[in-house]
Amino acid sequence: MLVLLAFIIAFHITSAALLFIATIDNAWWVGDEFFADVWRICTNNTNCTVINDSFQEYSTLQAVQATMILSTILCCIAFFIFVLQLFRLKQGERFVLTSIIQLMSCLCVMIAASIYTDRREDIHHKNAKFYPVTREGSYGYSYILAWVAFACTFISGMMYLILRKRK
């Protein structure tokens, strides 16, 4: 049982780390000479432009930012609730509250990555002065980590739903 508990905690911490990296790091769309994410665009690794309200489709990127931040916060809250439930639940009860919050985190990261997937091309075309060489780009590791975090938070949420507290 102790090994299973250690695995679940490690899996949850890994999910949270993936969410933090995907949210913070500047690699949602990358090319040879630029890096772009939902916070800023950097060309030549030196010239960075912060994405602000002068940016067209800014509300779309704000939705991605908000749902990624919310996903990360919910994942951290779910971990603390899990730790509390370890001490507060009676034997045989399920970790339903932790599961619900973790599945909400999963839903938020899925929404963020889906919005970015759907709207990326429009964002780049409408802001061509910020994205001068985006045609040569591809999805970066932060974007991929967001989808991996989606899978991890989903699996984690399902594990909590199935898991029962034992002695």
UniProtKB/Swiss-Prot annotation:
The UniProt entry's GO CC annotations, sorted and at most eight, read: apical part of cell; apical plasma membrane; cell surface; cytoplasm; cytoplasmic vesicle; Golgi apparatus; Golgi membrane; membrane raft
Q: Which residues are glycosylated?
A: 44, 47, 52
What the entry lists under Pfam families is as follows: PMP22_Claudin
Show the GO MF annotations: integrin binding; kinase binding
Q: Which compartments is it annotated to reside in?
A: Golgi apparatus membrane; Cell membrane; Apical cell membrane; Membrane raft
The UniProt entry's GO biological process terms, in alphabetical order, are: actin filament organization; actin-mediated cell contraction; apoptotic process; bleb assembly; blood vessel endothelial cell migration; cell adhesion; cell-matrix adhesion; early endosome to late endosome transport
Listed transmembrane segments: 1-21, 67-87, 95-115, 143-163
**According to Swiss-Prot or TrEMBL, what is its membrane topology?**
Multi-pass membrane protein
The alphabetical list of record keywords is:
Cell membrane, Cytoplasm, Glycoprotein, Golgi apparatus, Membrane, Nucleus, Transmembrane, Transmembrane helix
| Source domain of life | Eukaryota
| InterPro entries reported in the protein's UniProt record | EMP-2, PMP-22/EMP/MP20-like, PMP22/EMP/MP20/Claudin, PMP22_EMP_MP20
Its family remark reads:
Belongs to the PMP-22/EMP/MP20 family.
The UniProt function text for this chain reads: Functions as a key regulator of cell membrane composition by regulating protein surface expression. Also, plays a role in regulation of processes including cell migration, cell proliferation, cell contraction and cell adhesion. Regulates transepithelial migration of neutrophils into the alveolar lumen, potentially via mediation of cell surface expression of adhesion markers and lipid raft formation. Negatively regulates caveolae formation by reducing CAV1 expression and CAV1 amount by increasing lysosomal degradation.
The record's listing under PANTHER family reads: EPITHELIAL MEMBRANE PROTEIN 2, EPITHELIAL MEMBRANE PROTEIN-RELATED
Q: How does it assemble?
A: Interacts with PTK2; regulates PTK2 activation and localization. Interacts with ITGB3; regulates the levels of the heterodimer ITGA5-ITGB3 integrin surface expression. Interacts with P2RX7 (via C-terminus). Interacts with ITGB1; the interaction may be direct or indirect and ITGB1 has a heterodimer form.
This chain's protein is named Epithelial membrane protein 2
What organism does the record attribute this protein to?
Pan troglodytes (Chimpanzee)
